[in-house]
């Protein structure tokens, strides 16, 4: 029963549309009406500003991605519970109940989960992404690697 509550809570935390809130608070816009239309840090970067993307990224990675998985690891001693809470947070980010099931792509939230599950892999992933971006000036391909 505790795990079910944690998974539902993880979905609700993951559903917090922080990119939407940043767009509303800073420029009084619905970020979904601009750029890619997604509720994510990349769209905030492109349409609100770089300065606004950093808190958006931090919230997505640490509050939405890492925190639910970390708390699940403390409350339960079940690795599947940690993964279930992390996936619920990603699903919440991608299909947020608060904004009629629209959302982002879940990359930052999934990265937050990866930090909890295997921080060494997360560091390697960031390294490959940064190197790919420096060489090719495009992160789209490198984020997936």
Give the ranges of each region predicted by the language model.
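Cytosolic, membrane-interface loops and tails of multi-pass inner-membrane proteins
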Residues: 21-53, 102-103
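Multi-pass membrane proteins that catalyze or facilitate reactions on polyprenyl-/lipid-phosphate substrates
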Residues: 2-6, 15, 114-119, 134, ...
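C-terminal ends of transmembrane helices
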Residues: 19-22, 92-102, 129-137
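Interfacial segments of multi-pass membrane proteins
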Residues: 45-49, 72-75, 92, 107-136
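N-terminal signal-anchor transmembrane alpha helix
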Residues: 1-27
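Nucleotide and nucleotide-moiety/phosphate-recognizing core
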Residues: 2, 6, 52-55, 59, ...
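Short, non-helical or kinked segments that cap or interrupt transmembrane helices
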Residues: 29-38, 97-111, 138-144
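Hydrophobic/small/kink-forming positions within alpha-helical transmembrane segments
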Residues: 12, 61-62, 114
